[in-house]
Amino acid sequence: MKCPYCSAPDSRVVNSRPSDDGASIRRRRECLRCNRRFTTYERAQLEPLMVLKRGGQREAFNPDKLLRGLILATEKRPVDPEQLRAFAYGFEDEVQASEITSEEIGRRAMTFLRPLDDVAYIRFASVYRDFDSLERFIEEIQGLKGRGED
């Protein structure tokens, strides 16, 4: 490992231990030239979850983008922001695939929001399903009411 102080190419590991609940390894190193110590972290690099968009393009999954949509849907609603954050940042771990459609992300987000708050659910659904008329809102609300009576 290259020394950050003198750029020497060689160092020795003085101490090594798990970090971040075992998700990475913290190593204390000592430069063999200048004898200064520095810390490095080693983490497995996984292939990113790819999102297949409606237009056919592909992009890496971004939990911040999902979180923004959830926050907008739940704005001024009695929903714990930590629940939203946990869902968005845990989403990639829950998906057992290398690729997912944006439609599936939307479906899963709606499934997550439904028991939390009806208004947030409708807000998210209106964007995800691209409601273009008042009738679409009414249909969705009636569907919610029908499921609530089961």
Curated annotation (Swiss-Prot):
Binds 1 zinc ion. GO terms for molecular function: ATP binding; DNA binding; zinc ion binding. A zinc finger (unnamed) spans 3-34. Residues 49-136 form the ATP-cone domain. Its cofactor is Zn(2+). Signal peptide: none annotated. Keywords: ATP-binding, DNA-binding, Metal-binding, Nucleotide-binding, Repressor, Transcription, Transcription regulation, Zinc, Zinc-finger. InterPro entries: ATP-cone_dom, NrdR-like_N, RNR_NrdR-like. GO terms for biological process: negative regulation of DNA-templated transcription. HAMAP family: NrdR. Negatively regulates transcription of bacterial ribonucleotide reductase nrd genes and operons by binding to NrdR-boxes. PANTHER family: TRANSCRIPTIONAL REPRESSOR NRDR. Belongs to the NrdR family. This is Transcriptional repressor NrdR. It comes from Deinococcus geothermalis (strain DSM 11300 / CIP 105573 / AG-3a). The lineage of its organism: Bacteria, Thermotogati, Deinococcota, Deinococci, Deinococcales.
